[in-house]
Amino acid sequence: MAEIRNYTMNFGPQHPAAHGVLRLVLELDGEVIQRADPHIGLLHRATEKLAEYKTYIQSVPYMDRLDYVSMMANEHAYVMAIEKLLQLEVPIRAQYIRVMFDEITRILNHLLWLGAHALDVGAMTVFLYAFRDREDLMDAYESVSGARMHAAYYRPGGVYRDLPDSMPQYKASKIHDEKTTKARNENRQGSLLDFIEDFTNRFPTYVDEYETLLTDNRIWKQRLVGIGTVSPERAMALGFTGPMLRGSGVEWDLRKKQPYEVYDQLDFDIPVGVNGDCYDRYLVRIEEFRQSNRIIRQCVDWLRKNPGPVITDNHKVAPPSRVNMKQNMEELIHHFKLFTEGFHVPPGETYAAVEHPKGEFGIYLISDGANMPYRMKIRAPGFAHLAALDEMSRGHMIADVVAIIGTQDIVFGEIDR
């Protein structure tokens, strides 16, 4: 009699639902998954090693490219680690700007997650809506840094520059006539803060639109409820953080439990799931949209009323203004040294973590007193989540793996590093 064997199948890395370069080796009994083995490393770029040969400031753009949909949140952990070693005081205005952009980044990340997750499961409309709404936030990125994605806006000691007083305007073209262009420029007449405030007024309506399309949708619930269930104890044992941990009912958020910057002065809530399945994690992230919106509004109000410096006045770390540089020899020397040699960080080691859109993103930095790190270790939240994919997908169908990869919000830049 013929022996019945399990069937081995490769899922990805060319599969559209594999989120980049994920290769899964699935062991199947019929269509039921017995084992899922993620193969990683296809996007390994040696970021940790490269950082050892770059000055501290030169590594900031590398951070953007780790989780390349949560750019500024990555930078934040890195500059916080440097500030801890240097014992730098960050101006309060810079702290508010950072928090505001961290939350803008959270919305950017969750919009991409929602669009991709829905598209994987088969809902096309949400994907188009989400990308329509990301556009405004990308413009906010562009107005402060000149780049829509890889901003390199945070600096040790503050941020690169203050918020601009005017927004870039659309110009009429063959595709968009004068009338359409005028309508598109309507909310761009004021400063960046006016533009962001206008977005925060509109955004709750957008979130309601997503909920109308998905939350009570029968197909959506059939594909998500009871899939990839993780108990609170297992979630903690597996090293889950962020929405993956909160979806299992554990109220852990670094913004509340280990506050950094000005989070302890802001009013917001931590959404927590009940069942620990894909649907609960969806609901947690949807509520995070609303809470991030609340935080951004509070930051906008504060930033309007409180002008001030946005980067430290210690010219050993931050460059002097161009006006001073052209009038004073000492400032010119500071400027020259900063951009040739960089600044030296006292010997020591530190760990700085932020509540990244995907979980706890941490940077462990060791300095030997030179102008480059002796060692930099990146603690990527997605790495622990992907490691649990095997446990989460056992006993489910192949189609459910797609929903589980979606709910984990996998981005390979940070996993392979």
Swiss-Prot record:
Top-rank taxon: Bacteria
Subunit description: NDH-1 is composed of 14 different subunits. Subunits NuoB, C, D, E, F, and G constitute the peripheral sector of the complex.
UniProt GO MF annotations: NAD binding; NADH:ubiquinone reductase (non-electrogenic) activity; quinone binding
Protein name: NADH-quinone oxidoreductase subunit D
Function: NDH-1 shuttles electrons from NADH, via FMN and iron-sulfur (Fe-S) centers, to quinones in the respiratory chain. The immediate electron acceptor for the enzyme in this species is believed to be ubiquinone. Couples the redox reaction to proton translocation (for every two electrons transferred, four hydrogen ions are translocated across the cytoplasmic membrane), and thus conserves the redox energy in a proton gradient.
The keyword Translocase is assigned to this record: yes
Topology in the lipid bilayer: Peripheral membrane protein
Keywords: Cell inner membrane, Cell membrane, Membrane, NAD, Quinone, Translocase, Transport, Ubiquinone
EC id: 7.1.1.-
Entry keyword Metal-binding: no
